[in-house]
Amino acid sequence: MTAVRRSTRIRTKSQVIEEDYDDEQNTSAQHVESDKITAKTQHEEEEEQDTGESEESSSEDDYEDQDDDDYVDTATAKRKSRKRKPKSASNTSSKRQKKKPTSAQKSAVSHAPAYHRSKKDQDQYLEIAKDFQPTELFDILSTSEDVSIEELLREWLETYSENRDKFLQEFINLLLNCCGSVARVEDHDVHSNESSNETIGEIQLLFQRQKLHEFYLLISKENKKRKNFKMGPLYQNFAEFMTKLLEVANDLQLLYVESDEDDTQIVTGNLVLDLLTWLSSFSVCKIRCFRYISTLTLYLFQDYLTQQAVNLEKNYLAKLSKQLSLEEKKKRPNNKTLEKLESTIAETQGSKVVIDSIIDNIVKLCFVHRYKDVSDLIRSESMLHLSIWIKNYPEYFLKVTFLKYFGWLLSDNSVSVRLQVTKILPHLIIQNHNSKSTDNSAIRQVFERFKTKILEVAIRDVNLDVRIHSIQVLTEASSLGYLDDSEILIISSLMFDEEFDPFKTSSFNKRSKFLSTVAKFLARVIKEKFDEFIKTHEDLPKEVDGLEVGPVVQVGIFIKILNDSLIYHLKDCAEVDSRTKIRMLTQAAEFLSPYISTHLKTICNLLISDTESNELIQKLQNSANNNSDDEDVDDEELDITPLFPIDRNSTILYLNVFHGLCAGANNPKIQTKDSVKEIVLPLFYDLLNAASIESADILCPLLESFITFSLDDWISIGYETELKKITDKTIKAFMDSTIGNSKVDMKYDIFAKFIHHIHHFEKKELQEKFLNQIATLKIHLKKFLQEKMDPNNSRDDYKDLTCSLYELYINKLTILGRDYPIEVDEELLQLFLNNFVSRIPIMFQDFDDSTAQEINFKMLVLLATWNLEKWREIIEKVRDYENSISKDLRSVWKPIAAIIGRLNTLVISLAATNETFENINSLFYLKWSACTSLMDIIVAIKIFELKLPADATTWRYSMSEQFPFYLHDNASKVLLKIFLYLESLFAKQVDVQLERVADEDANLNDLPETGFFENIETEFLLFTVKLKGLMKLNILDERFASRVALNKEKLGPLFKKIVDDTIMENPEPNKKNIQKAKSNQTQREKAPLQPNSERETDHANTENNDPDIPMTIDLEPIEESSQNNSELAPIEEHPTVVDAIDNSDEITQD
């Protein structure tokens, strides 16, 4: 094969200077024909857009599928083997394959351990390596952490003039040692640069025959942080060695020398020509590690050369030229000085020309090929060092010619390459923007060309890190005005991406980092738009009605852009309910808190003040209206007209943003909590007083904001006394409100959270207020039951009466009873059981679905569990409880027995009610609600019994006397029917054909859809957990258990674990089991039902029902109680029995 030697091209200076990129590329292509393997064709789209530039980048595009005989992973090897099959039929490939085996046969995985090879290969490798000794340079670089690289280089470079062949021999052997090659060259092998290709070819064959390889340089790079790694310093020392090599060579006058033909001409030194010749031959080798190390070495040379070129220009040529100019301006210039200055300038210019020539050759001989190498490591190194060259030498590299490579590699199929590119681009934009000496037209031109691709990567890339850094690129670009309004909306709307579920988003994961990055982008946009607005409204006053104009306008613009971004996000989405919109808006505000929380005082003042009469706001609104009348606004144009809380919708928007900003301050990484509480807490009561809190949409974000602050926060700023006024105001709203079912009424959850939060303050005066409300509610409830629900009076408004009963009394008592003890006298209990509970089967015919969903028996569970809790505390405190407590324990158990008996009767009566297609769902819901409460009470009683001291025989006897049975036989049958119903609904959802026993109802396969449950799987599994608890307590028999387990193989792994009693297993704490547990935890996170999946985070405004997940904590020890009661600790795990049982509306707590 005829080829033009690279050394010849380098020595021919006229060619180097005169030939353009295309001519040099064609010449290089002839020489590097063996590098066909390394080409990549990722940039076809870009090359089609610019055919002139495509000629530079496509010289190797036809070579992509050739053999690459170095380290490839298994997947790559398979892919390559598939690509090579058609080519193996060709004559050329066949001949090549006869000479040597294919790459899949002869190369190992990169730095793979020896046991990946056959015993024969290992023995052969050990035999070869037995007498092998690495070079002295390699030994020093790989083991010495404190070696003086400059001294080492100086001593070594001095040998070049004495013995050039030995010097090159040591240099090449150093590279080979770093690649793990046992082959080495002798001095006669490197005597002639003309034979460099042949020599490299022989080395390549020897390397392939070695079979086992260790790429020590790359291993050192990837393990540099590991302690006690034997070659830890190799990569760092090697990089410093090659970076300083030309610097020391320059000190020794080896970088450029005077020409032999013309003493005044400066030419490239022989050392550089030798190094470039051999390194360029290595860089087109088919061995990947050879290409990597030679490319890295050339790039490190270039790092120094770009610095030196600028150094010569700024520190020598500029100063010398200035001295020359000053000397020439003198009246009597000194001719000798002028001659000396001119001579020095000419010599320095000659040196810079040589350096520019070397830089140019490294680009042409290496970079333009290696930036699209088959190895993503080499492609990444190419982009990394190109950014260094642009930073060092912008006059040469900050051009479209080089910047386009970043745009092309945005489409790279390797995540690491795309990530490298997106990490570099923001710094390039910042560097260019801050530099006064360079023109930013190249950056602008390249950004405009690849802007669409950057946006696409930011929105759709499969790797979250790449998306994060792409948005950082757009953030810097937005500051320079490179983004249109429509493009700003595209990115800012990512704040509301439904993919980032609040259950998955936290301050410690990548999703959170993504939203934080978008928040930073949005904050930058808001600042830019504010500056733009102020420039166009210079006539605005500084202050109006006590409000500073600047912060008010900035807040208005922020709210407007945030609102427009949400609207844009929802434009192409399916219909989203209001709760989801609020959650998305609040979450966005949380992540914007670090940038916007300083404006919380302005937001509070706007919400407190009368915005309708504010002169400034009216003026801005009139200006906005005039602008909208004069111009047609595009839907995708970013409207920066400030938005203020002038109506109900905008007030709700402001309050939810206010809540998000307060919640975001709780992030410990932000450290704005102190400043936020000093702003918000003094104004909170005024805010609560000014707001229309009778509306749930306004009340919820306000109380959510209150919950984000602890008692210590109030005490630290001296506003603890405000808590009494806030509590009074909230209690009044609570008592005046009608509170419906928690699934449909947001007030249910927010009042429950507020009361729970105040309860944790442990302030007696505040707790007494809630206890007083319980007493008041009981009085009004008794009156309502006597007057409105008298069974002797025939009425036709049972539906409305039932809703009123729950909305005015039962739901409120249930909310209060979760934190404060509820005790009712026998009369009130009997009124509720007789006048309402026992009459439900009669009133049922007047109920619709919404009324049926309103009914629950949580208050009965609370009454029973608080009663048990009271006696448990007495038993714990009193030593001689057998004698000190009345022997007649009938009064203790009478109310609980009445509740259990009435719920049993209700369940049986509902089961006897005639089912129709219209009422089947509501009837099932009532039976399910009664059964779940009944099971909760039974488990609470059994826990109480199991926790009794061993000598409490009187208590145990009285319990057996008062509770001859817990569950009636007919009620047990109802439990089974409910299980079958839920099982059928879940099977229908997952499209599973169930097995059934002979006497089961065939209609269970055709049940209508029910809207009572948000998640059928959750309710089905939780009900199964309750049933398993009763089975462990021997309340349900084995026949029941066998039917529950009938379809355990078909209904998912979690159901099977519940049935098999393996869901709460705790493996031995050894390393192997810990790793297994982590794996299982990962699987559980992906499962449809998660133990915490129903617990709402602070991002949400509502909570889902979580009926009895904590029950599993209590049920598991029960099985062990027959052996050792001392191991039972369900009560101690919860403050009260109430907490252990009544979790049907459990509030998420920090």
From Swiss-Prot:
Modifications after synthesis and translation: Acetylated by ECO1.
Annotated GO biological process: cell division; chromosome segregation; establishment of meiotic sister chromatid cohesion; establishment of mitotic sister chromatid cohesion; mitotic sister chromatid cohesion; protein acetylation; sister chromatid cohesion
UniProt-annotated location(s): Nucleus; Chromosome; Chromosome, Centromere
Biased composition (Acidic residues): 44-72
Composition-biased stretches (Basic and acidic residues): 32-43, 1083-1101
InterPro entries: ARM-type_fold, Cohesin_Scc3/SA, SCC3_C, SCD, STAG
Positions bearing Phosphoserine: S28, S628
Residue span of region Disordered: 1-122, 1065-1150
Subunit organization: Interacts directly with MCD1 in cohesin complex. Cohesin complexes are composed of the SMC1 and SMC3 heterodimer attached via their hinge domain, MCD1 which link them, and IRR1/SCC3, which interacts with MCD1. The cohesin complex also interacts with SCC2, which is required for its association with chromosomes. Interacts with LIN1.
Record's miscellaneous remark: Present with 4090 molecules/cell in log phase SD medium.
Homology family: Belongs to the SCC3 family.
Role this protein plays: Component of cohesin complex, a complex required for the cohesion of sister chromatids after DNA replication. The cohesin complex apparently forms a large proteinaceous ring within which sister chromatids can be trapped. At anaphase, the MCD1/SCC1 subunit of the complex is cleaved and dissociates from chromatin, allowing sister chromatids to segregate. The cohesin complex may also play a role in spindle pole assembly during mitosis.
Protein name: Cohesin subunit SCC3
Gene of this entry: IRR1
